[in-house]
Curated annotation (Swiss-Prot):
This is Probable cell division protein WhiA. It comes from Clostridium perfringens (strain SM101 / Type A). Keywords: Cell cycle, Cell division, DNA-binding. Involved in cell division and chromosome segregation. Pfam families: HTH_WhiA, LAGLIDADG_WhiA, WhiA_N. The gene is whiA. InterPro entries: Homing_endonucl, Intein_endonuc_central, Sporu_reg_WhiA_N_dom, Sporulation_regulator_WhiA, Sporulation_regulator_WhiA_C, WhiA_LAGLIDADG_dom.
Length: 316
């Protein structure tokens, strides 16, 4: 089961809501996955989904809250996945006109009915109704990627005006949803992991939220370990390269003028580095008598490298 299906399965069990919340929720579902059909003077409305839990919820809300006994149909998809497609249909005899009016989908102006692509503010004038609306939008047209791979949550809509309204509604909760066009659709999306967690909390997907949080924590721990390993590897590589360079410089001095020509403090460090090419500066310093700190050893080795460079260029 995909992570999207898990989220939808969870929030579709969220049915202990008021009639006002149910109205907000079914309005959002109808806006994002519904189509209006005309046959002569008759109209009908169809909601389409591949998720059986979503279809069941649509049917239940209409029956329990609005006394509408919708028609539930199932057919095979023509896509390669061969999933079932579930359709919840409300006809004129079932009271579709009244439903379209109270959900803010149809609006009558001067006796003429027209489609309203905006979100009716009366449907989302409380925080709970806003949450119910966003939950409905996810049930009807939302999806979330596998958090093991990437963080991405989106709502697919078919109107720019509606997508912008939905984005603004989501952002009233302090989120940063954005809108883009993808072919003939308008996508409201969130890509930041922490914000996706917040949105799951808003729509009531608490089990999915905890699963995502656990994945985020594990990914962060793995990333921290990888950064630490990479950092230590880089430091080790830097240390090894420095040691190799120091040994080469000391051997050059030994070959050209002999280590005996070096001052005692430099000669002692040079001899130790030749004998212990893999030891750290701190460990070399502890072998000296009296012991010398890491910075002191580093200073002496830099002087040795400078002498070697002068020998290479003939300036010694």
């Amino acid at each position: 089961m995909s992570f999207s299906a898990k989220v939808k399965g969870e929030i579709c069990r969220y049915i202990d809501i008021s009639k006002e919340e149910a109205l907000a929720q079914i309005s959002a579902i109808m806006k994002v996955c519904g189509t209006l059909a005309f046959s002569g003077r008759q109209i009908s409305f169809k909601m389409t989904t591949e998720n059986p839990a979503s279809a069941r919820l649509m049917f239940t809300i209409l029956k329990d809250y609005f006394d509408i006994h919708a028609k539930l149909m199932v057919k095979k998809s023509n896509s390669l996945k061969k999933n079932n497609i579930y359709m919840v249909v409300v006809t004129e005899e079932m009271g579709v006109k009244k439903l379209l009016e109270i959900t803010g989908i149809l609006r009558e102006i001067d006796g003429i009915m027209s489609l309203d692509y905006h979100i009716d503010e009366n449907l989302v004038d409380t925080e709970e109704k806003k949450k119910a609306y966003i939950r409905g939008a996810f049930i009807g047209g939302g999806s979330i990627s596998n958090p093991e791979k990437t963080y991405h949550l989106e709502f697919v809509t078919h109107s720019q005006e509606y997508a912008e309204d939905l984005g603004k509604l989501i952002n009233t909760f302090g989120l940063k949803a954005k809108v883009i066009q993808r072919k003939n659709s308008y996508i409201v999306y969130i890509k930041e992991g922490e914000q996706i967690v917040d949105l799951l909390n808003i729509i009531g997907a608490h089990t999915a939220l905890l699963e995502l949080e656990n994945i985020r924590i594990m990914k962060e721990m793995r990333n921290n370990v990888n950064r630490l390993v990479n950092c230590e590897t880089a430091n080790l590589s830097k240390t090894v390269n420095a040691a190799v360079r120091q040994v080469e410089s000391i051997k050059l001095i030994e070959r050209e003028i002999g280590l005996a020509r070096l001052p005692k403090n430099l000669r002692e460090v040079a001899e130790l580095r030749l004998t212990y090419p893999e030891e750290s500066l701190k460990e070399l310093g502890e072998m000296l008598e009296p012991p010398v700190g890491k910075s002191g050893v580093n200073h002496r080795l830099r002087k040795i490298e400078k002498i070697a460079e002068e020998l290479r260029t003939g300036n010694f």
